Amino acid sequence: MPDIKLLSEGIFEIMKDKRQLATLNLDPGKVVYGEKLISVEGAEYRTWDPRRSKLGAMVLKKFNIPLSKDSKVLYLGAASGTTVSHVSDIASEGAVYSVEFASRSMRDFIRLASRRKNIFPILADAGKPDSYAHIVEPVDLIFQDVAQPNQAEIAARNAARFLNKNGYLLLSIKARSIDTAASPKEIFKEEVKKLEQAFEPGFEILTARDLMPYHEDHLGVLAKLKE
């Protein structure tokens, strides 16, 4: 029988031939992106590939992941739902408001959302939060993974509009979407500075780590609103 270890609420490590990250499957018997299903003592787990998920990489890079079963989450950059599906597993009794701009990705994503009662797909530009303000309630966590040059600004706009006072921001900063020539370290430094000074009261940076070896030229950031 595989060994299973709880890493944080709703996130597990399973040892079966090799160490694998996993979440408890909210949609038993179904896979989302070709991941493996592993049954342990009557419960079904979905393996979570950190090379296909910035959030999965953050787990393995020892970030604190402020998610619980009743979390309300705003996910910016949902794509076709690979990582959103794992957030849905974790926040099984919460809500995952999922914003994606590409209509092709959204078509695939809607099929996933139709099987999971806690996912709310939103076809919109994450840089224009007022366009979906009538749908999204105040949230406990904003997770952002967008490939736009103004990533810090997008995070700040959405936090100002939706993030609870005691909420958190998890952000994957993709250096090459901001500047293809500059040093990633310099880009990361500037983006973190923008977050700290983005708006009143600004963000307090709790953790900032590169996501190697899972994602090249990416920085993971955990932040909360300053007191």
From Swiss-Prot:
It comes from Methanosarcina acetivorans (strain ATCC 35395 / DSM 2834 / JCM 12185 / C2A). S-adenosyl-L-methionine binds at T82, T83, E100, F101, D125, A126, D145, V146, A147, Q148. This is Fibrillarin-like rRNA/tRNA 2'-O-methyltransferase. Disulfide bonds: none annotated. SUPFAM superfamilies: S-adenosyl-L-methionine-dependent methyltransferases (SSF53335). Interacts with nop5. Component of box C/D small ribonucleoprotein (sRNP) particles that contain rpl7ae, FlpA and nop5, plus a guide RNA. It is an enzyme of class 2 (transferase). Belongs to the methyltransferase superfamily. Fibrillarin family. GO terms for biological process: box C/D sno(s)RNA 3'-end processing; rRNA methylation; tRNA processing. It comes from the Archaea. GO terms for molecular function: histone H2AQ104 methyltransferase activity; RNA binding; rRNA methyltransferase activity. Its EC number is 2.1.1.-. The lineage of its organism: Archaea, Methanobacteriati, Methanobacteriota, Stenosarchaea group, Methanomicrobia. Keywords: Methyltransferase, RNA-binding, rRNA processing, Transferase, tRNA processing. Involved in pre-rRNA and tRNA processing. Utilizes the methyl donor S-adenosyl-L-methionine to catalyze the site-specific 2'-hydroxyl methylation of ribose moieties in rRNA and tRNA. Site specificity is provided by a guide RNA that base pairs with the substrate. Methylation occurs at a characteristic distance from the sequence involved in base pairing with the guide RNA.
